[in-house]
Amino acid sequence: MKAWQRQFIEFAINKQVLKFGEFTLKSGRKSPYFFNAGLFNTGRDLALLGRFYAQALVDSGIDFDLVFGPAYKGIPIATTTVVALADHYDRDVPYCFNRKEAKDHGEGGTLVGSPLQGKIMLVDDVITAGTAIRESMEIIAAHRAKLAGVLISLDRQERGSGAISAIQEVERDYGCKVISIITLNELVAYLAEKPEMADSLIAVRAYRDEFGI
């Protein structure tokens, strides 16, 4: 685990974005941890979040031309990511996001920002069922652009209803790489370094043993 990944985990815990306990997921599973990126909700939070996304993008080595944020949660993530790329890596990358509803006045259409063209890096908070990715792929394909990759905050590394995860399904269906700032394995490694979090470590490991990929 890299130092910036450890810092991201601590950032998420401090902001109560990452919590430990017992949580019922939409799937009905009882999870010993919960990640709610919506609680990154101040200017300072977003500035720091953008730096982590930018760091993960640069480290990945994936070649891309534009950052796309699917509505709604992906919009501030895309914005803060390109600001961080400009401020910290001297990379002036265009960005774009979609509206859920098309406008029939002003600039019109469903897209806001730079033209959706070239190699697209899609950014979002998490992938649960992959629905937002599939909707975004329809938009990207309609503009004859190509999906270069997907970046999310946390890869839960757990099976969906079948034998593979929603992330693995996206990689299989669209032939792209899905990367994350942290994975469940890195979260387990972090907990193992913290004696005071031993109970959470036991619960998360048991969950990974049952549902992990």
From Swiss-Prot:
What Gene3D superfamilies does the annotation carry?
A: 3.40.50.2020
Can you supply a Gene Ontology BP term from the record?
Answer: 'de novo' pyrimidine nucleobase biosynthetic process
Q: Provide GO CC annotations from the record.
A: cytoplasm
Q: Which cofactor does it need?
A: Mg(2+)
Q: What is its EC number?
A: 2.4.2.10
GO MF annotations, alphabetized: magnesium ion binding; orotate phosphoribosyltransferase activity
Mind listing the UniProt keywords for this protein, alphabetically? Glycosyltransferase, Magnesium, Pyrimidine biosynthesis, Transferase
Record's catalysed reaction(s) = orotidine 5'-phosphate + diphosphate = orotate + 5-phospho-alpha-D-ribose 1-diphosphate
Give the record's pathway.
Pyrimidine metabolism; UMP biosynthesis via de novo pathway; UMP from orotate: step 1/2
The UniProt record gives the binding positions of orotate as: F34, F35, T128, R156
Annotated residues for binding of 5-phospho-alpha-D-ribose 1-diphosphate:
26, 72-73, 99-100, 103, 105, 124-132
- Pfam families with a match to the protein in the record: Pribosyltran
What is this protein's function per UniProt? Catalyzes the transfer of a ribosyl phosphate group from 5-phosphoribose 1-diphosphate to orotate, leading to the formation of orotidine monophosphate (OMP).
HAMAP family (alphabetical): PyrE
Q: How does it assemble?
A: Homodimer.
Similarity section = Belongs to the purine/pyrimidine phosphoribosyltransferase family. PyrE subfamily.
Name of this protein: Orotate phosphoribosyltransferase
Upper classification of the source organism reads:
Bacteria, Pseudomonadati, Pseudomonadota, Gammaproteobacteria, Enterobacterales
